[in-house]
Amino acid sequence: MTYLLTVYRALECRPDTYRDWYDQGNILRERMDYLGALISYEKALEYYPDDYWAWYKRGMILEDLGMYEEAAQSYANAAQVKDDNYWAWYDQGCVYLQELKEYEKAIACFQRALSHSPGDYWAAYRQGEAYRLLKNYERAITSYDLALGARPRDYWAWYRRGDAFRDWGNPQEALFNYRTALDIRPQDYWSWYQQGVILQALQRLPEAIACYEESLKIDRDDRYAWYNAACCYAALGQQEKAINCLREALDIEPDICGELARNNFVFDGLRQNETFNDLLSCHSPS
């Protein structure tokens, strides 16, 4: 309350007009005085309730303050003032998608944004994300295709398109998309790793191992790539390589990987192997 009174005292000394409050809000926002900026925009709106920019920037400030429900409503008010404005719909959609996890509302906002800017990459991509998170993979893929129409070599659209095909139960299409993402970012850990997971599930184990090895060249500290490679080697009967990979995984995350190895039937062929048992014993929970 003391802070609020201090801000009000300073601002009330200024000419009592919409423009002065609005400009003061912009100045305070640049200084990252978000609460002071919020007060200023709200005072501006008392004089000019139908001002698009005051509602829009109020939404930005509320986002900065972590007040996401209020931010979405402020963007909605801005959109009511200027229904044909892309940004109020897009930013409102981003709040619903990323912060509030209200994916259907996010989609409705992105659709409105796209109606005003049909070829926009970002609204199409984020619409795809909302559909993917709702498990509506067909529409997610259609949205990613729209995004790729704007940016044909966009890594994220190809990668998330791969995620959608994977979760939709189409591993071959997923592999194609991850490989395309890799063409754009050859040193991307995740595209290599996701290919490995799919190839492992398809029992194409040597190919899966090759992908895990590539991912580990980029990030040697990933426990799951080491663990999954160990599983592949164990399934192929290559016990020494399986143990070596498992050792790396256990050195990074002994509790999780140790529990997985103790309960995974793929290692049943190693249960009588002294090195394997010693390895698990050394990394057993204290």
Named regions from a protein language model:
Residues 30, 64-65, 98-99, 133, ...:
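Register position in tetratricopeptide repeats
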Residues 18-19, 52-53, 86-87, 121-122, ...:
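Helix-start (N-cap) detector for alpha-helical repeat units in TPR-like alpha-solenoids
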Residues 26, 60, 94-95, 129, ...:
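Residue-level recognition of tetratricopeptide repeat
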Residues 4-10, 257-286:
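Terminal, low-structured helical/coil segments at or just beyond the last alpha-helical repeat
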Residues 23, 57, 91, 126, ...:
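Canonical tetratricopeptide repeat
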